Amino acid sequence: EVDAGSCNGCEIEIGGLTSPVYDSERFGIHFVASPRHADLLLVTGPVTRNMEIPLLKTYEATPHPKLVVAVGDCAQTCGVFRGGYAVVGSVDQVIPVDVFVPGCPPEPAAILRGILAALDRLPRR
């Protein structure tokens, strides 16, 4: 998960995915410490000037095939941060996005649906 400049509301909801209620691991979803071990990047917030290059490097470090899920209104439209001096733009203005999950913040169930929709795009093994 990459916080590109969010208020952390989406991160709180992402944390709920590992709770017994949503149990994202039952779908084979595991949060990893390195993009080199990831199939998918969750990105939150508008992309700030300080996070533009780190986001690009994280995307480049993720092996192919790679997926990106932009979580929250700010990731999609910059939300309340639109026009801010420190904001570069939405996530899709910096890296390709496969699925957008709208909401401010979106509920864990919506985030889980977005992740599963993105994973459906991966070739079957």
Predicted regions mapped to residue ranges:
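Iron-sulfur-associated redox domains of electron-transfer enzymes in respiratory
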Residues: 1-125
